């Protein structure tokens, strides 16, 4: 979450007249994240999250995102739910941006995830994949293989200023992925951004997932690969196989991976790493100074890509044989 667009109390008060959520008592911007502008609202009825959708978010995608949250909640998955406006819709406009309010999810994200947290995330992700199986809307992943080279071309000219030799490395990785990207794997609704700051815990119990604004219809095992990148590396960028095994064990206890999915995991993990390297690199070079947003270092994912290049089998990530189904 982040803040790109400032709002004042007068315009916020007018916007809230369209909702039945009580009277505003306070609000504050949320700095974490990189995509939209988010505010924590406190009203006489409780706490809520207000999101103003910035230019990267297509207004036409909002029914998918908000409808997905409603669908998953109806299937028992803990996640924020859109608040319905007085006119029966869930999307309004504030400060010239499309805007929505969702319920506040109790819990905290884990800055130092444990093995147990990783297993819970794997299990929760599998439950989300199953819960989304009958969701009727579809959305193309706008940050997958076909999108990576155009995104790379926006940063290529300055990439070596971030890391000498990065152009050569990235070109080789993209060529490899374009040649080896798997096809015909099981598809469905994926979160696509399930980092630790998008997963809340109450104590050691997973209390829910947030921030579904990259969710889309894509390869389910790619979502697992995103989580391996996000949850199973240490601060020194070394891969923690124990955490990886726990995450994969949690996932496969609910939804076993097919043999084809398991075989594809090293390529999917490398692809997931380059996806986040590319968006971080673009933001690192282009996010305007003064924005109330935390820029994230693309080099974290350059180092993870270097690790994935050495991996040949899913077992090296910690996938146990009994976790894979034919």
Swiss-Prot record:
Keyword Transcription among UniProt keywords: no
Top-level EC class as recorded in UniProt: transferase
EC number: 2.7.1.39
Keyword Cytoplasm attached: no
Pathway linked to the protein: Amino-acid biosynthesis; L-threonine biosynthesis; L-threonine from L-aspartate: step 4/5
Gene Ontology BP, a term: threonine biosynthetic process
Molecular function GO labels: ATP binding; homoserine kinase activity
Keywords: Amino-acid biosynthesis, ATP-binding, Kinase, Nucleotide-binding, Threonine biosynthesis, Transferase
Catalytic activity: L-homoserine + ATP = O-phospho-L-homoserine + ADP + H(+)
Family affiliation: Belongs to the pseudomonas-type ThrB family.
Protein name stated in the entry: Homoserine kinase
Organism placement in taxonomy: Bacteria, Pseudomonadati, Pseudomonadota, Alphaproteobacteria, Hyphomicrobiales
